[in-house]
């Protein structure tokens, strides 16, 4: 059992190595005697090889060389010191004391193995020979120079003449030294090959021994495990079935030992501890020691186990007959059970297919039955008292549920899932007339409506061929709107609806036939709805106007219902009233019209307006005269969706007739839902003239909430008397998404924009900045200190005409864009939102068209004026503790549309716009402003509506006065509202995370000559330590934040004959290194640098691998680093 390692081959290899070494030492002795005639010689002592493991190495008895001749031996001192230098690279533990031990003595005494000693000795000898050859070549060149001088007639001194006579001898010595170098190189290569071969063979022998041990342990474990079986014990007790006879006493020893080595799992111990105990038993067994165990010794157990293994019984353990008989019935039982299972599955599948054929019924009716079981949690409380009608319906429809399983379209699985969702909604017909319709339900209805049209078309074609539609109308006379909601709830994929615009037309042509009788009794709710537009429009007419008016009349109910809903539900509810193919055309009426850019027409839409801007304006004015009252739908700020997920390629969709029921209905609802979302400070546009600006923001992003920007501006005078109180009297408070916070919104006279924060992630990127900020609690939110209402006044120092409400549409055509903003800026009043970033460009509404000033496309830059104006920003810490900008209120604009000059007492700034670089915020302390313009500056800043940051969905920023007269503190998302004549482009100002300021520079003022290898370099002078990240005591830089760092180091070598090696370390890894040595005792600099990507907690330091560093008060040796880019 005990493994014996044969070392005969290893000894043979090492003996050959010694022979090579002896030959090499003989040659080297001759060479050194010839090279160094006046110096002591190397004494190479090789004792007889007692064993391969202990090889006494070369010893050198002498001090380093000292040579007398100035001509040829000036570098021989260097040769001796080089021999002491190289060993330190590998294994020297004695420092740099050049006079203590001889170099080879110190090297060989510290060598870890004979091979390392051989390699070091050979390498030093070759270096010595190389230097001798170089010296002879120098001497040869000098002698050639002497000969040339003699030929030229120059007189030489006697020493020079004697040296010239030895020229031939020098040539001979040089040739001999070169040949000797070749011989030594060959010998050293052979020696190293023999060494490596011997090491490889030794390693293989060790590996085989380890494998044999492991194999033996596994065999023993197998034997001990099988000894626990009764029939195996009987065989050994009786010597049956080829087993060796064992006395019961010895068998008991083995059984007890098997319980120790192969124990059952002990839960009180960890697996590692338990296996460690077992391994100790196995180890002692392999050793065969005389230790006592289970009443005997390990040596005795080892003998017994060897006897069992050699018997051959365990090669194939015989199985008793009883065990075989038991195994057969078990297999038969398993087969029988599997057959039964297959038969049961077949019968179940047959029954299921029969039942599917039996219960094929129309697809619409099952919705009423199953809705009672799959009721939504939102509507459960309102429907508890109305559960009797479904039983009567169910009695009439016993065979309904299975119709859904018979659908054989490719998307049958999807329709099954849709049916369950649609069944949930069928009971909602009982509360069509109730004002307390859940807004969340309305949001879900609308998001599902747009993608359900293709399935609706299929289902309607099936239902028309059967008598079910008429029966369904008779059964549920009140459920027309509820049915549409059911159809809308069938789909969960809102991204599909823009692609399906073309498919909408067919169902709209089919459905009004079956819906018209029921709609005649419901059209009296609102007189503006005179013509059924489509199935969705008809179904929503009776429900929505009532619920909106009731919401206004009783705000308590609307507040409680809204508190559970995100702001998106308002925009969605409004958008859902209109068919999809007319929802897009309506945007022409509701957004600014000064955008003559050619656009793509959406699929399935129709436009009756000409493309020419002037003709379009005239046509719209003619159409407006046909409506009761005048509606200002002239603003065309269109959101340009450039996402690949959106199939709407429009930046200016075609228009619909403003007088259509769609437009009038939208006018009522959108004006009523003003400020339903968190308002944003916007530039007050003279187009509105004290109008009610509503921007229902919706999203077509992948988050599932699909909405679109709509802006409807309804002058107060143009609203019909019956609708004006509901739309203007008490606007509903907006809901902050996720936090259920109510905000008080300004009255309808203020010009503001509502922005939904969450869905902006997928819109076109203006500034790709996403700085997540921690949410704040509700109690931190304060009301705005500004008055909720104001009167917009226009103060201008020029003689130009006051702004008009309708302007020629040629204005933006003349807008000049700077080169860098062409990609991101949209002159049509686009509101760009992306990735938590917002940039709002209001419509340019000047009386005299003039080019807009270019602005700097830089992240976080505030875009200001170009001529004579100035942009003043002031760092201000907002209530949330985040840095933003403090922008001053705009002064009355001058005729060229720029800011008028602010007079500062302390200092003046140039009129050029300030461009900000990344992560840099300009901070100017404000001096006192002149009293004249301050009185008139209120007009541009009266609107103090609160704002919701795109970075924080559930909190509000409060805009508070900074207390410095007209200065106003801007929160990170405030956008200034300036005078209408000022052509200013306010931009979202991001709360960018402040980059850390990290930089350090350290130096040494004293020499560093450690006695051992690989020592850290510690600095004694700190020139700079910005950020307190460099530990002077340890000489280590601790990375404070993830980012890209730059490190530079310069180390001046001490004037010794030892080369300098310096490593730049990250933790314990060598990144870059520097080396300095020319072989002469002189100062040289080892330097390098690196640009590294570090993570927080990484440590950067310098390691002196070998050599010595020079230090002085002039600080030659330095180490510096700084943060380049923060992640």
From Swiss-Prot:
It is a peripheral membrane protein. Promotes phosphorylation of the Wnt coreceptor LRP6, leading to increased activity of the canonical Wnt signaling pathway. Facilitates constitutive LRP6 phosphorylation by CDK14/CCNY during G2/M stage of the cell cycle, which may potentiate cells for Wnt signaling. May regulate the transport and translation of mRNAs, modulating for instance the expression of proteins involved in synaptic plasticity in neurons. Involved in regulation of growth as erythroblasts shift from a highly proliferative state towards their terminal phase of differentiation. May be involved in apoptosis. The C1q domain is essential for the function in Wnt signaling. The modification Phosphoserine is found at residues 948-949. Homotrimer; via C1q domain. Found in a complex with LRP6, CCNY and CDK14 during G2/M stage; CAPRIN2 functions as a scaffold for the complex by binding to CCNY via its N terminus and to CDK14 via its C terminus. Interacts with LRP5. Interacts with LRP6. This is Caprin-2. Keywords: Calcium, Cell membrane, Coiled coil, Cytoplasm, Differentiation, Growth regulation, Membrane, Metal-binding, Mitochondrion, Phosphoprotein, Protein synthesis inhibitor, RNA-binding. Residues 67-108, 382-614, 642-753, 922-975 are annotated as: Disordered. InterPro entries: C1q_dom, Caprin, Caprin-1_C, Caprin-1_dimer, Tumour_necrosis_fac-like_dom. The keyword Acetylation does not apply. It comes from Homo sapiens. Residues 99-108, 512-531, 544-567, 665-714, 741-753, 956-970 have a biased composition (Polar residues).
